[in-house]
Amino acid sequence: MISNRNNNTSIHNATVENVEGKYKSIGDISTEMLNPVIIDKTVWTIFNNLNIDVQYPLELECYLNIVEKSYNIIYENKFSINWLPTMGTACFRAILGDKNVTITCNILQAIIISLFNDTNNLSASSVYNKTGIQYDLSEKILESLFEANIVTRKYSSNDTVYIVNTHNYTGDTNINIINEFIELFETPVNSSNSSVNLSMDKKSDDSKIQETDISTAETDVKFLGDEDYVDGNEDCISDNEDAKKYDSDTDSDLGDLEDPNEPKLIVDSCSDCSESDSEEY
C-alpha cells in the first residue's frame, strides 16, 4: 500500500518555487493544505466511479501538479496517478455579502466554486465547456450550490443561469454542502434545457448580468487518486533518502522533500478546515 501519512508529511515540508508560467497568478502556495489519499488500484477496486476527464481550474490544477511531482520524486516516476474528482473533499473560505463563510464541499463542487472567482454567473453548458463535466452532472452540482444558498438562479430561454449570492446570503458562516450534492445526485434536475447542445459557444447568453465576484481564500484540499504501475511490481516504499530534484518543464518546481526545516511559502489557512494527516489504508 501507499504510505500516505509519510508522503503527506514530505509534501507539507516541501519548498515550492512558483516560477514564471501559467501558475504565476496564483501567488503564495501552501502545501500544508494538501492531504492526498493515494491508493494502489491493484489492491483496491473502486466501483461506480464516473469516468470524467476533468479540466481543473488553474489553482486546483496547480495543487494536483505539486502532489504528482512529489510522488514522482519519492517513487522515482514508478507510478502514474489517476485523480478521482468524485471522491475528494475541499474547504474554502469565501465572502458572501458581508459574511466570511467556510464551505466544505466535494471536489466537483470545488471545481465550480473556483470558477466563480472569474465570473459571477455560470450555467451547466458553460461549466461543461470550461471543465468537461457533463451537462446533467454540471446542473446537479450547480443545483447543490443553490440548495446551500451560495448561488441564486435565473431561468432564461436557453439555460438556467446560477449567480453568486452576494446580496441575500442568510446562511451560516460554517457550512458543509456535500450532502446537498449527494441528495441531488440520484434525482433528476428540473432544467429548462435538458437537451442543450454541448458543443455550443463557451460564452453565456447572460454575460451582461452585473458582476459581483465570489472571493475565495486558500483551500484545504484532500484528493483521492489511484496509482498505476509504470513498470515493475516491487513493493512501495515509505520514503526515499536519495530522492532527487525532479527536473521538468512544468510551471511549479519542488525543492528537497526530505528536509522538514526547509522554508515554506505559507499563507493563512482556514483554521476550521484543518485536517489531520490522511488515514493510511
Curated annotation (Swiss-Prot):
Disulfide bridge map: none
Pfam annotation, one family: Cullin
UniProt xrefs under InterPro entries: Cullin_homology, Cullin_homology_sf, Cullin_N
Biased composition (Basic and acidic residues): 200-211
Disordered: annotated segments: 192-212, 227-281
Acidic residues bias locations: 227-240, 249-260
SUPFAM superfamilies named in the record: Cullin homology domain
GO MF: ubiquitin protein ligase binding
GO terms classed as biological process: ubiquitin-dependent protein catabolic process
Family statement drawn from the similarity comment of this UniProt entry: Belongs to the cullin family.
Protein name: Uncharacterized cullin-like protein R337
